[in-house]
A protein has these predicted regions:
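Short loop/turn segments at strand-loop or loop-helix junctions that form parts
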Residues: 1, 8-11, 62-63, 84-87
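Nucleic-acid-processing active sites and adjacent nucleic-acid-binding tracks
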Residues: 2-58, 262-266
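C-terminal nuclease/phosphodiesterase catalytic domains that cleave nucleic-acid phosphodiester bonds
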Residues: 63-235, 239-240
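Extended acidic low-complexity intrinsically disordered regions
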Residues: 220-224, 232, 236-266
């Protein structure tokens, strides 16, 4: 009866900020709620500097309302939109994409939609480890210093926090007596956690795990921020997905139901 979407921002050292969480009410078998979701692709969010930032990537979970989700991805025709499906285990956060669309002859279409598997255990373990981190005070006694991976959360209600922390990693024995680690739900509702997992996968697809200092400097340049002195090594152009995460001209913003808005946005 709804679609839930979280907007997360990521920075140096994989520091993260929950920007916004929306609950779009509506029957997923009907078009209205999907149209509301599509409107987010045209929106921008205001950086603290005043620059407008669009979504760099948009990951859509296809595990529920699968055919409707596929239809949404096809209709968007937007390279930022990626269909994803969570799997318990994997060697990498994002797996090799699988082609879904086929021709009448049964051959997979090269230009059809592809579904990326997401090893949810990797993202959840990283997230829960980062939630344990705390900020420190700089040497001047005034500046707040955040460690790599620190998770910034705005004012959120207890229900949202419980959803973020809805699972725990346990060890059980399989039928052969070998130990197996798996995630176990402690409560039924875990949409907030799922939204983070797929946002983290989207950030990885946009290049987060491969970013070097030069990439962050280029993003800062696009935002009009005065960064540290330039490196001696030349800055190379970054890929299209990263550029979409930089400064863009904003159109009229389509507003939706707001549940959370970060204090880091103006």
């Amino acid at each position: 009866d709804r679609i839930e979407a979280s907007v997360w921002a990521f920075g140096r050292g994989k520091e993260s900020w929950l920007v916004e969480h929306r609950v779009l009410m509506g029957d997923t078998a009907r078009d209205a709620v999907w149209k509301s979701l599509a409107e987010m692709l045209a929106e921008t969010w205001t950086h603290a500097s005043g620059a407008a930032m669009p979504l760099a990537r948009f990951a859509l979970d296809t595990g529920f309302a699968t055919q409707e989700a596929y239809a949404f991805v096809r209709a968007c025709r937007d390279s930022r939109v990626m269909a994803v499906k969570g799997v318990p285990r994997g060697a990498a956060l994002i797996g090799t994409p699988t082609a879904i669309d086929v021709s009448q002859g049964g051959k997979k279409l090269r230009r059809g939609i592809k579904v990326y598997t997401v090893a949810v255990s990797i993202a959840k373990l990283e997230f829960y480890n980062n939630l344990r981190k705390s900020a420190d005070v700089g040497e001047d006694g005034l500046t707040t210093v955040f460690p790599a991976g620190f998770v910034h959360l705005p004012k959120i209600d207890a229900e949202f926090i419980q959803q973020l922390c809805a699972e725990q990693l346990i060890t059980r024995r399989d039928r052969n007596g070998f130990p197996v680690r798996e995630w176990q739900k402690m409560r039924e509702r875990n949409e907030a956690l799922d939204c983070y997992v797929y946002a983290r996968a989207a950030a990885s697809a946009a290049g987060l795990d491969r970013f070097e200092e030069r990439h962050w400097r280029e993003l800062e340049r696009q935002l009009g921020l005065a960064g540290p002195p330039a490196l001696e090594t030349p800055t190379e152009s970054i890929n299209e997905a990263t550029q979409r995460g930089g400064l863009a001209v904003s159109g009229n913003r389509n507003t939706g139901r707001r549940v959370i808005k970060s204090r880091w946005l103006s």
